[in-house]
């Protein structure tokens, strides 16, 4: 039997209020989002049935993910020169157990449009926009490395049952067996992605020439990393844990030009970026027999290639000795 079904539902609702007085302006937004995901995937066949009196399949599972979020955003500005924004989110995910399911995530950003200042008037006809900005914020991440709830929480529903699969005989016949799932980590919770960002936007020649530049440092705290390898005497795998911190630093540059010749409009855009990810902390550094180039090592960049340094080649037996 082979069956597959997938459903995804998403609802976003928000309301806002704006008010201006003099050179001041402000805006407040309130919103919520609601997501439901359900996947049913089954392939099954049966041989050596323990009994034919119950012709049905057991231990079937579905993969469900639910997420709810509530957010608030407040913005304020003065004369198009000074800008501020504050955000707060309260997110919940069914990927975590009940007491670890919800968390708060704030962020704040500031901007300064220098092109609106009086001391910039001499250049304002050429440079229409020159905005400096900076921001700090946190977002929650549920980790994209493990898609199934059962990958995270292998409860008894995943206990495997096999017919006539034992390695020993009783009365000349192999016996039915069951195997325990992995250990459950009841403390697993959100990964917190904390980002610092500094950059500027510019526009010149009536905004025909535009560009942005950003430098950022993004730290993923309590990242769900590889579990340690435990002795085979345990009989199962170690549970996944929030055991790793990683920092990604990089920059992004974008420059564009758009113009019109008679009725012909055209535009070009150039993008350039670079970033590197570095493992800050990982408690099982160097303890895995299966660590490879893609493994986690404290203080090393992700996917960095490194190894032993050569001290030279021996050209005689004396040097070998």
Question: Regions from the language model: what does each represent?
Answer:
Residues 1-309:
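Extracellular/periplasmic, surface-exposed regions of secreted and cell-surface proteins
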Residues 316-321:
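Short, intrinsically disordered, charge-balanced linker/junction segments flanking boundaries
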């Amino acid at each position: 039997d082979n069956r597959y079904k997938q459903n995804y539902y998403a609802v976003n609702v928000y309301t806002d209020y704006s008010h201006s007085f003099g050179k001041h302006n402000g805006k407040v937004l309130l919103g919520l989002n609601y997501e439901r995901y359900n996947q049913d995937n089954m392939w099954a066949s049966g041989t050596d049935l323990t009994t034919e009196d119950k012709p049905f399949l057991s231990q079937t599972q579905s993969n469900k993910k639910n997420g709810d979020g509530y957010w608030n955003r407040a913005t304020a500005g003065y004369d198009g020169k000074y800008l501020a924004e504050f955000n707060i989110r309260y997110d919940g995910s069914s990927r975590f157990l009940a007491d670890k399911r919800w968390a708060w995530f704030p962020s704040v950003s500031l901007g300064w449009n220098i092109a609106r200042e009086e001391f910039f008037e001499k250049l304002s006809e050429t440079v229409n926009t020159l905005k400096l900005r900076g921001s700090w914020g946190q977002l929650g991440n549920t980790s994209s490395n493990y898609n199934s709830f059962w990958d995270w929480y292998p409860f008894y529903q995943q206990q495997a049952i096999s017919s006539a699969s034992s390695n020993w005989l009783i009365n000349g016949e192999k016996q039915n067996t069951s195997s325990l799932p992995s250990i459950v980590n009841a403390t697993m919770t959100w990964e917190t992605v904390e980002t610092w960002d500094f950059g500027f936007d510019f526009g010149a020649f009536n905004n025909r020439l535009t560009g942005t530049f950003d430098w950022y440092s993004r730290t993923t705290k309590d990242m769900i990393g590889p579990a340690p390898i435990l002795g085979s005497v345990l009989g199962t795998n170690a549970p996944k844990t929030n055991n790793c911190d990683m920092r990604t630093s990089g920059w992004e540059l974008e420059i564009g030009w758009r113009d019109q010749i008679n009725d012909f409009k055209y535009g070009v855009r150039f993008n350039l970026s670079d970033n590197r990810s570095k493992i800050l902390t990982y408690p099982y550094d160097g303890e895995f027999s299966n660590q490879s180039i893609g493994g986690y090592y404290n203080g090393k960049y992700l996917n960095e290639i490194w190894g032993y340094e050569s001290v030279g080649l021996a050209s005689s037996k004396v040097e070998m000795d």
